[in-house]
């Protein structure tokens, strides 16, 4: 694990790199960059991140955040699916169907986040080199003939510093444990690659998953997609544009539909 100083330095470097790239692409991005630096890289924020990595504060803060988010999400799910929605939840290898994980379970997933990490790495799904690679997370003990539901994770990073490494590890570890196969992807970065390059890459990755995931034990007929920030935008757009030939150059007739999408900021 990297030291707090290394983590803070990395985040600052990423911010400056992003700012440099965006400013070269458009002078109008100056205000956005300054706002990002002030909001996400202010001294008090960096100090908090540094302290959290070397003290129990990280676990306490995470527990409080999980509890708050759980109340909001629970209310939304009850309003949509009814108060008994947990009884409708099924995971393929879940030993306690309908059971809602508590804060301790979430923290445990974070602690063991590498348990199923990237059992197959850097698979090429397109022509753009490293920008078109993906990793597959899965349990090594999946039953023979088993067809696991698939979750595609689209990383965030202002469409310019996105990387499949280091994002959503607790989520993918937990879903893998429940019997899912998770696929995390790289895609083209701005400003060297302008829109719609990003969404074309995401849809190309979906097409690859549909055509190949059965070889890894996945079910091509049940593919969900998620992502945060820029990844949330792209996962939403991908879910809403299945079969749009203008966003699928060279693979116009490929199946890029998904069965579910869960974007977040």
Kindly give the residue locations of the regions a language model identified.
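N-terminal membrane-anchoring alpha-helices
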Residues: 2-91
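Short beta-strand element of the alpha/beta-hydrolase
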Residues: 145-157
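Alpha/beta-hydrolase active-site loop signature
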Residues: 158, 187-191
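Short N-terminal helix/helix-N-cap motif within the alpha/beta-hydrolase-1
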Residues: 161-165, 192-193
